[in-house]
UniProtKB/Swiss-Prot annotation:
The lineage of its organism: Bacteria, Pseudomonadati, Pseudomonadota, Gammaproteobacteria, Vibrionales. Its EC number is 3.1.4.-. Residues 214-425 form the HD-GYP domain. It comes from the Bacteria. This is Probable cyclic di-GMP phosphodiesterase VC_1348. The keyword Lyase does not apply. Signal peptide: none annotated. One of its GO terms (biological process) is phosphorelay signal transduction system. Induction: Transcripts are more abundant in biofilm cells than in planktonic cells. The modification 4-aspartylphosphate is found at D120. Residues 72-187 form the Response regulatory domain. GO terms for molecular function: phosphoric diester hydrolase activity. Probable phosphodiesterase (PDE) that catalyzes the hydrolysis of cyclic diguanylate (c-di-GMP). Increases motility and decreases biofilm formation in vivo.
Length: 441
C-alpha cells in the first residue's frame, strides 16, 4: 500500500500549510504528532504568558501602593467649616475636591476621576442616601468607595447606608487621625480592586489574542492534514477550498429554517467549515494504483476505495485518543469523514445509514463533494457545466441527498457558481457557466 509522510511548510501571512511527501509512518501517528506539537506550543505559550503576567501584576501592585498621594478625595458636606477642617487634615496626603451639596458632588464626579468620597448624610435638597444611590447606579462611579459622615449613631441608619453601598462610617466631630486611617485603608482596598480589574482586562485581552492565534494554528493544521490526502491526487486542485465553502453556504441557508434554526449556530457552521477539508483524509491509506486509476474500478478495487471513509474516522479517533484533544472540530471531522458517502435512502456506505440518522454535517458534505466532482475534470471524465451537475443532483433528491439540502442548494446555486469560479483550478479544469446558461454539447 502506498502511503505518505509529510513535511509542513506554513506561510506566515496566510496561515495555509503546504505538504511535502516523504516515506511514511502510520496516519494516526502523523495526526498524533501534529496535535501533540500543537498542544506543546499552547502549553509553553501559556506558561510564558503567566510568568510575564505575574511580573507585570507585581510591579503594578508595588507601584500602586506607593502612589496613593495621587488619589483624589471628594468631601461632600453642607458645612464650610467641616469641609475646611477635613481638607486641612488630608491635603498633605491626597488631592482634595469639595462640594457643599449632593448636586454639585454628582457634577464633580461626572467631570473628574475621584478615588474616594466622604459624604455627609444630612444635607438640604439632596441627602447623602440619595447621592450614594446615584453613585452606585452609575457604571462610571459605582466602584468608588463612599464613607458616610454622620453626627448620630443609629444602627438602622448604618444598616441602610451599608445596604446602599457605603464602605464605612465616620462620626462627627471628626477625628483627623481616625479619618486618615479609614481613608488610607479604603484607598488601599480600592487600589487592590483596581489592580484586579486591570488584571482581568489584561487576561481577557490575552485570552482573546491567544485564542485567535490558536484558531489560526488549528486551521493550518487541519488544512495540512487534509492536503496530505489531496497530494495523492494531483487533479483535485482547490477541491478542499471549494467544498468547505459549499458546506458553509448550505449550512447558512438551512439555519434560516425552523428545523435547523436552533441547531446551526454561527459557531457550529464555522466548525463545519473548518472540518470539511478533512472529509477524504482516509484516502492517504488507499494505494495509488486504485486512487489514481484512470478507468473504472473493479468490484474489489471499489471495495478498497470505499474503505477510505472508515480509515479517515479511525485515524482521527486514534489521534484524538493519543493527544487527548477532544474537540467539537474533531467530532465533526469524524462525522464528515465517516458519513459523506452515506445516502438519504440508506443505500450509501460504509454503514448504510438512512435519513436523519446521517449526521447533518455529512449530508451537507455529500452534496458539496458530488457537485464539485461533477464540475471538475478527472482522469476518467470531462468537467460538466453547472446545469448538468444540477440536473444530476436533482435526480438524487430523496435518494442520494436530503431533500432539505437540495432545497438549500437551489436557493444558493449562484453562490455555488461564484465559489467554483473564485477557487477555480489553475488549469481551468472546470466549465465556467452563469446561472441559467445552457451547457454546450
Amino acid at each position: 500500500m502506498a502511503t505518505a509522510n509529510i513535511a509542513i511548510k506554513q506561510n506566515s501571512s496566510t496561515n495555509i500549510a503546504f505538504i511535502e511527501r516523504m516515506p511514511s509512518p502510520s496516519l494516526h501517528r502523523i495526526l498524533y504528532n501534529l496535535f501533540s506539537k500543537f498542544s506543546y506550543s499552547l502549553s509553553n505559550s501559556c506558561h510564558f504568558n503567566l510568568k510575564c503576567l505575574n511580573f507585570v501584576m507585581n510591579r503594578m501592585f508595588h507601584m500602586s501602593m506607593e502612589d496613593l498621594s495621587q488619589c483624589t478625595i471628594l468631601i461632600v458636606d453642607d458645612s464650610p467649616d467641616n469641609i475646611a477642617f477635613m481638607s486641612q487634615g488630608l491635603a498633605q496626603y491626597y488631592r482634595i475636591k469639595a462640594a457643599r451639596s449632593g448636586k454639585v458632588a454628582l457634577e464633580i464626579l461626572a467631570q473628574y476621576p475621584i478615588d474616594l468620597v466622604l459624604l455627609d448624610i444630612v444635607m438640604p435638597e439632596m441627602s447623602g442616601y440619595e447621592v450614594i444611590n446615584q453613585i452606585k447606579h452609575n457604571p462610571h462611579t459605582e466602584h468608588i468607595p463612599v464613607i458616610f459622615l454622620t453626627g448620630k449613631s443609629n444602627p438602622e441608619d448604618e444598616q441602610l447606608g451599608f445596604e446602599l453601598g457605603a464602605v464605612d462610617y465616620v462620626f462627627k466631630p471628626v477625628s483627623i487621625p481616625l479619618l486618615k486611617s479609614r481613608v488610607h485603608t479604603h484607598l488601599q482596598n480600592k487600589r487592590s480592586k483596581d489592580i484586579l480589574l486591570n488584571q482581568n482586562d489584561y487576561l481577557e485581552t490575552e485570552v482573546l489574542r491567544r485564542s485567535g492565534e490558536l484558531d489560526r494554528m488549528q486551521d493550518a493544521v487541519v488544512f495540512a492534514l487534509a492536503s496530505l490526502a489531496e497530494t495523492r491526487d494531483p487533479e483535485t486542485g482547490n477541491h478542499l477550498l471549494r467544498t468547505q465553502h459549499y458546506v458553509k453556504v448550505l449550512a447558512q441557508r438551512l439555519a434560516t429554517t425552523d428545523k435547523y434554526r436552533d441547531v446551526l449556530s454561527p459557531t457550529v457552521i464555522d466548525t463545519y467549515f473548518k472540518a470539511a477539508p478533512l472529509h477524504d483524509i482516509g484516502k492517504v491509506g488507499i494505494p495509488d494504483n486504485i486512487l489514481l486509476k484512470p478507468g473504472k474500478l473493479t468490484p474489489d478495487e471499489f471495495t478498497t476505495m470505499r474503505n477510505h471513509a472508515l480509515l479517515g474516522k479511525l485515524a482521527l479517533e486514534k489521534a484524538e485518543k493519543l493527544s487527548g484533544a477532544c474537540t467539537a472540530l474533531i467530532n465533526v471531522a469524524k462525522e464528515i469523514a465517516m458519513g459523506h458517502h452515506e445516502k438519504w435512502d440508506g443505500s450509501g456506505y460504509p454503514l448504510g445509514l438512512k435519513g436523519d440518522d446521517i449526521p447533518l454535517s455529512a449530508r451537507l458534505m455529500a452534496l458539496a463533494d458530488v457537485y464539485d466532482a461533477l464540475i471538475c475534470r478527472r482522469v476518467y471524465k470531462e468537467p460538466m457545466s453547472h446545469e448538468e451537475a444540477k440536473a444530476i443532483i436533482l435526480q438524487g433528491r430523496g435518494s442520494h441527498f436530503d431533500p432539505m439540502v437540495i432545497d438549500a442548494f437551489l436557493i444558493e446555486e449562484q453562490n455555488f457558481i461564484d465559489i467554483a469560479q473564485k477557487f477555480a483550478d489553475e488549469e481551468s479544469a472546470m466549465v465556467p457557466i452563469q446561472l441559467g446558461q445552457q451547457a454546450s454539447g
